[in-house]
Amino acid sequence: MTPNEQYSGGLPPLVPSAPAIDPWNWPPDSGWSPQRNLIGYHVKATDGNVGKIDMATHAQDASYLVVDARRWIFGSTLVVPAGLVSVIDHSEQNVYLICTKELVKSAPPLKPVDGKFTNRPDRDKLARYYRAALSR
């Protein structure tokens, strides 16, 4: 079953309760700064490693991480909205998420347009997915 089939067939996997998120903006207390390069940092969900950051954006209402998850999901690159970041540990080069690996893995895919993940309908679908999952 594909991630889209899983999502369209019901709610995503349950995760611990989390505050409402603004998916496409960095949380103000996350430790994010446009002066810091996050490429190569490890991304960690609440239950383990997701992958390494290949790209991080900081555009208003369009911030996200592109994560190389090939060691975990064969051949996969994932887009993780910046609003899922709880904290960034610059000394250890780790980015911690507010959700589980399964939630990230089951998310609807976001396809690049001209090398950027800015397709509005896909972004809206991804935002709805995470809001629904994290508000339960």
Regions picked out by a protein language model, each given a short descriptive name:
Residues M1-R136:
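Peripheral interaction segments used for macromolecular assembly
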